[in-house]
Amino acid sequence: MNTSQIVLMFCLVVGVAQTALALKEDDCEVCVKTVRRFADTLDDATKKDYKLIEADFKKFCKTQKNKEQRFCYYLGGLEESATGILNELSKPLSWSMPAEKVCEKLKKMDAQICDLRYDKQIDLNNVDLKKLKVRDLKKILNDWDENCEGCLEKSDFIKRIEELKPKYTRSEL
């Protein structure tokens, strides 16, 4: 083999390895979806200045809940955040880097960013509430921003969910 063939083979192997190592949306779902949603809120002028992106991200984080709020905490987008790697988000976004690549860089800085996963949604029209754990019943109510005053038994939580079900779920026609 001559030198050019060896170089070509090396480049091919490196290219295949990079493709295999590339982050997929499922590997880092909360990061990718949150970065995409945030990037979609930015106007053209803001996208060019990483300082403005950081300021907008902090505003964006104030409205987030659950997993997205935890993501903001890890990056330093919340006032109570212990660390701050916000520039690892803002600078790549100012260069129009795709969300997957941004999250790949963030994962190298802090691996727990990609450990965040969305909870599986419970299909209330098809699930038997009696078979769920109390923890899951409480989570359903919490997701609806509802509480169950005086609920002690599982049957109390089920009764409350059944009362609220028409308000929060749509039945398919």
Curated annotation (Swiss-Prot):
Disulfide bonds join 28-114, 31-103, 61-72, 148-151. GO terms for biological process: dopamine metabolic process; dopaminergic neuron differentiation; neuron cellular homeostasis; neuron projection development; synaptic transmission, dopaminergic. Residues 1-22 form the signal peptide. One of its GO terms (cellular component) is extracellular space. SUPFAM superfamilies: SAP domain. Pfam families: ARMET_C, ARMET_N. It is found in: Secreted. InterPro entries: ARMET-like (IPR045333), ARMET_C (IPR019345), ARMET_N (IPR045332), EF_Hand_1_Ca_BS (IPR018247), SAP_dom_sf (IPR036361). Its main location: secreted. Keywords: Developmental protein, Disulfide bond, Secreted, Signal. Required during the maturation of the embryonic nervous system for maintenance of neuronal and cuticular connectivity. Essential for maintenance of dopaminergic neurons and dopamine levels. Belongs to the ARMET family. This is Mesencephalic astrocyte-derived neurotrophic factor homolog. It comes from Drosophila grimshawi. The lineage of its organism: Eukaryota, Metazoa, Ecdysozoa, Arthropoda, Hexapoda. The gene is Manf.
